[in-house]
């Protein structure tokens, strides 16, 4: 958190000087340079903010407590939280959740965050479909067609700061946070990409 704080101060100064320069009468090519500098400063600002959030999440995870909880309800709540986003993107998820109660040793807030990050990623890269399955052995599989991905990109989805498309306003921390949280809970998260379908599998700690 100290690093991200130390980066914020000079960034604020850069923005201040940029705003002053943009108010001056400048040749057109200088204006283009200033716009380019502002864009890169904005990207660095976002990276700093996400780094700050990442360090907060990871530090909180150090004191994480695990409980035996029902996965059905946690998954249903996570899907409900993304209902408006899915609807806005014209995605109607295919959901399969057993009637029987599936339990696992997890931290509810952490697992909710993991699922939220996966769903957010799915919305970004989905071709319009989404399949969510909770199996009886406690695995949660979230899959969708993602023709914009490659196998190499899929393998790097959990890398910190890696983003598939640099044009997207994201530094790629969402899934790396999900991986860190799953490891803290003694579970796993994996990605499999075959025939243009990306599947994220979350496996919680068994009882």
Model-derived regions: residue spans:
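Short conserved segment of the HATPase_c
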Residues: 149-161
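A conserved beta-strand-to-alpha-helix junction within the catalytic ATP-binding
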Residues: 65-80
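Conserved catalytic submotifs in the C-terminal HATPase_c
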Residues: 67, 92-102, 137
